[in-house]
């Protein structure tokens, strides 16, 4: 008799996605981050749901409702910090996942890659709106500064900003709508993840060599379910260490001060996972130019497949490209550091050099390196 998992309409989908899925036998630990990105939103939705039960999206009570969650709700502090630090873990996994895609040439699966970029934008938007909800100083001023960037759009900019605010400044209407969007977006993200996986399973997974592995496939279960479980345990351990020992390590102390529109913090900065883009924004003295650079810092990912000039898919056997890739990683870490520094010498210059290097590596140096490597292959 045929196993029910192969005949039942619903179980059949799960079976083809998680159990009998033919998977390359040589995929490394870098492929674990895909499954970890399935775990992270589940944690966020679950903890977020419990937080939403106690949170009030009103400018007068938002800050005190978060305080109430931490002080009076049973394990409220744990739920809150799991949610906040869970977002940090989410972005760590996201950035490594994207980096792995660039390194091993996974961007040649165009549909999967493009849905991934849309997912990245959606997650960034969700995280930004979530940061506004506690209504601390950095929440308020972060929301004011970032939404104000839209005013750089010619003709419709100012109208657009006031439309998003629901008034003439960031106020009650803004907070309410941000809460509504922050609640609904994770479910839209979950739907997009399904589409992402649908396109991935059309082609099958890439592997470190970048060579088609149809002749060497193994079932996903038990091999990769066990491997992914190890990844889950490592991520949960890291998250719990962060939450239980230093929950405020990645936060901003200014956000423990209630929002005050009469008092601007000395250094307005977003959460650490946006600092690289924030540094690129600040490195351009022109407002519209800065906004375009900010958007392009992520949108440049969509151009990468068009600039693939190498005869090989993966960087596994391309030493020049490998060096450039790790320089790019170091550059992003430098930008992250600069984004958290005040706008003064020498940070301005370092930020500008790092921003130019970021775009140069992706748009000019990597395609050139690939062409040189193609020539070397003929020698």
UniProtKB/Swiss-Prot annotation:
Alphabetical UniProt keywords: Electron transport, Heme, Iron, Membrane, Metal-binding, Mitochondrion, Mitochondrion inner membrane, Respiratory chain, Transmembrane, Transmembrane helix, Transport, Ubiquinone
One function term, GO molecular function aspect: ubiquinol-cytochrome-c reductase activity
Binding residues annotated for heme b b562, in chain numbering: 83, 182
A Pfam family reported for this protein in Swiss-Prot or TrEMBL: Cytochrome_B
Residues where a ubiquinone binds: 201
Biological role stated in the UniProt entry: Component of the ubiquinol-cytochrome c reductase complex (complex III or cytochrome b-c1 complex) that is part of the mitochondrial respiratory chain. The b-c1 complex mediates electron transfer from ubiquinol to cytochrome c. Contributes to the generation of a proton gradient across the mitochondrial membrane that is then used for ATP synthesis.
Other observations noted: Heme 1 (or BL or b562) is low-potential and absorbs at about 562 nm, and heme 2 (or BH or b566) is high-potential and absorbs at about 566 nm.
The protein's name: Cytochrome b
Species of provenance: Sylvilagus nuttallii (Mountain cottontail)
Gene (UniProt): MT-CYB
């Amino acid at each position: 008799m045929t196993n029910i998992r192969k005949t039942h309409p619903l179980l059949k989908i799960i079976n083809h996605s998680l159990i009998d899925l033919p998977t390359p036998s040589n995929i490394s630990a870098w492929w674990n981050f895909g499954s970890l990105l399935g775990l992270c939103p589940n944690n966020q939705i679950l903890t977020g749901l419990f937080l939403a039960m106690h949170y009030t999206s009103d400018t007068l009570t938002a800050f005190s409702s978060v305080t109430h969650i931490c002080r009076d709700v049973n394990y409220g502090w744990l739920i809150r910090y799991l949610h906040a630090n869970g977002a940090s873990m989410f972005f760590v996994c996201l950035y490594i996942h994207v980096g792995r895609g660039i390194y091993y040439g996974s961007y040649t699966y165009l549909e999967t890659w493009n849905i991934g970029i849309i997912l990245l934008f959606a997650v960034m938007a969700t995280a930004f709106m979530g940061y506004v909800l506690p209504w601390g100083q950095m929440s308020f001023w972060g929301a004011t500064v970032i939404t104000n960037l839209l005013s750089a759009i010619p003709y419709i900019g100012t109208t657009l900003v006031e439309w998003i605010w629901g008034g003439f400044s960031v106020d009650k209407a803004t907070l309410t709508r941000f809460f509504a969007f922050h609640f609904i977006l994770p479910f839209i993200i979950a739907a997009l993840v399904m589409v992402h996986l649908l396109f991935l399973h059309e082609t099958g997974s890439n592997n470190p060599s970048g060579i088609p592995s149809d002749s060497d496939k193994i079932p996903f279960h038990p091999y990769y379910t066990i491997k992914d479980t190890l990844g889950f345990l490592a991520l949960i351990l890291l998250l719990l260490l962060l939450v239980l020992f230093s929950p405020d390590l990645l936060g901003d102390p200014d956000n423990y001060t209630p929002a005050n529109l009469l008092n601007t913090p000395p250094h307005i900065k977003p959460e650490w996972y946006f600092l690289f883009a924030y540094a690129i924004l600040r490195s351009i003295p022109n407002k519209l130019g800065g906004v375009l650079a900010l958007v392009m810092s992520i949108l440049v990912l969509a151009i990468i497949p068009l600039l693939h000039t190498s005869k090989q898919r993966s960087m596994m056997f391309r030493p020049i490209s490998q060096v450039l890739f790790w320089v790019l990683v170091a550059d992003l870490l430098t930008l992250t550091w600069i984004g958290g520094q005040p706008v003064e010498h020498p940070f301005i210059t370092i930020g500008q050099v790092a921003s130019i290097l970021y775009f140069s590596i992706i748009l000019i140096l990597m395609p050139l390196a690939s062409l040189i490597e193609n020539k070397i292959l003929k020698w």
